[in-house]
Design a protein with these regions (language model features):
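Secretory/organelle targeting and membrane-embedding segments
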Residues: 1-151, 155-438
Length: 440
């Protein structure tokens, strides 16, 4: 994949939290790395009545106030902001899309753009089904030029709504031009799972039901929902974390090696894992799924007391479940998945529990040896930790465990920002790390 000569990145929801906290900081890093197309501009769209100048001033103030910019980024901030433009419009009002069309035509000669547009939907999900149609009806999807679209989660509320969205997007875009973003796939440690597996003769031969006892996938936080009550009460932990982030981690852990690591090879193997999941019948759910909700404690309010949450809400803030991948490699191996808010710690990790040796020749001073563990830490302190058996120093032959720990931070290696990687891929037209549609 290669960058086009010219491209407009059109961001709907340009005055929102996602754009301010995630997209703009990531775009500055891409700008400083000189990884934009030769002629590139960002056009922010939202209802707020900014001009180019006032929007740039707003972004500058917010980015400096965040304290996230490096010294180099502070020095190049004005140069980056010179590529940013703004069009005041209402993404929910079809009549305002003509304003966007006119603005893009006005900017096209300056940037030698012949209709290459990448649309980013950083908006509430209720607009996801409206924007593609409004873009089409306003003539913004006409040839010539490439037309791509990036959609944030959640992509639908349930199966029926996801199917409806897929039909809408398929009517206006090719599947290869639809980028359903899951920022977990942009994380360096998540991508490293595949390298650790398929690039190693140590792990891949034993990465199966014969040697692995069970797998744990955990993503928990030690804080509540904050100011997200309006969104979260309509979603919950299952929709917010399990059906996207944690299922992606499960798929990458369980997938077969692709014949070729490209957009089709990787995503097709991910789909095969989903197709192999044991069906979640009512009986299975009763026996293998736990849902919960955090309550008030000494130093915190309960979920139902959070702002914009219904006082009788039954929305889950904690989910734990046991899943099975019914195929040759994983038959009978349980995958334990859990996520929750207001937990004792904040961590996202995958733990591979290997089976102990068939005969325990050596004993531990206390308890039983349960087997080795491979821990893939996604956040915080990204890295890989291996717990292996060792002899306890001293008389006798007592077993103990030793930890071999690799951390990116300890080796002065920056893992980079997930949005940087995914935005770079979308600019270059590489959908490998984006979700492929499985439902129609």
């Amino acid at each position: 994949m290669s960058l086009p000569h010219s491209l407009f990145l059109v961001i709907f929801g340009a005055s929102g939290d996602l754009t301010r906290r995630k997209l703009m900081p990531a775009l500055i890093k891409i700008h400083n790395g000189k990884r934009f197309p030769e002629h590139f501009a960002i056009i922010g769209c939202a209802r707020t009545a900014y001009t180019d100048e006032t929007y740039r001033a707003y972004l500058k103030e917010e980015l400096i106030k965040s304290g996230s910019l490096t010294k180099e980024e502070m020095e190049t901030l004005d140069d980056f902001l010179s590529t940013v433009h703004y069009q005041s419009m209402d993404p929910a009002d079809e009549t305002t899309y003509s304003l966007l069309n006119d603005r893009l035509k006005e900017l096209s000669p300056q940037y030698e753009n012949n209709g290459n547009y990448l649309f980013y939907l950083a908006t509430p999900p209720l607009l996801y089904e409206l924007i593609p149609k409004y873009l089409h009806d306003a003539g913004l999807l006409k040839k010539p030029g490439l037309k791509r679209i990036i959609v944030e989660k959640p992509f639908g509320y349930d199966l029926a709504s996801a199917q409806k969205l897929n039909k809408i997007y398929a009517a206006y875009f090719k599947e290869e031009d639809i980028y359903r973003i899951d920022h977990f796939l942009g994380k360096e440690t998540v991508q490293n799972i595949m390298v650790t597996r398929f690039g190693s003769t140590i792990y891949e031969p034993i990465w199966n039901r014969n040697y692995i006892d069970h797998v744990e996938i955990t993503a928990v936080e030690n804080m509540g929902i904050g100011t997200r009550g309006g969104y979260y009460d309509g979603a919950g932990a299952l929709r917010d974390m399990v059906q996207n982030h944690l299922m992606q981690l499960l798929a990458i852990t369980a997938m077969e090696p692709p014949a070729k690591f490209d957009k089709n090879g990787f995503r097709n193997e991910v789909i095969k894992v989903y197709q192999s999941l044991r069906p979640l019948t009512d009986e299975y759910i009763r026996d293998n799924v736990v849902r919960g909700q955090y309550i008030a404690g000494d130093d915190r309010i309960g979920y139902r007391e959070e702002k914009n949450v219904h006082p009788d809400s039954r929305t889950d803030t904690y989910v734990a479940m046991c899943l099975y991948v019914d195929n040759w490699r994983w038959q009978g191996v349980p995958f334990y998945i859990r996520t929750g808010k207001q937990m004792p710690t904040k961590v996202t990790e995958i733990v591979i529990h290997f089976k102990p040796a068939p005969m325990q020749m050596f004993q531990m001073k206390e308890g039983l040896y349960k087997g080795e563990e491979l821990i893939i830490r996604i956040q915080p302190d990204e890295g890989i930790l291996q717990r292996i058996a060792m002899k306890e120093p001293g008389a006798g032959f007592y077993m103990g465990t030793m930890e071999m720990d690799f951390s990116y931070d300890q080796h002065d290696q920056e893992t980079g920002d997930a949005y940087v990687r995914l935005l770079e891929d979308s600019l270059a037209g590489d959908p490998t790390l984006f979700t492929l549609s499985l439902i129609h």
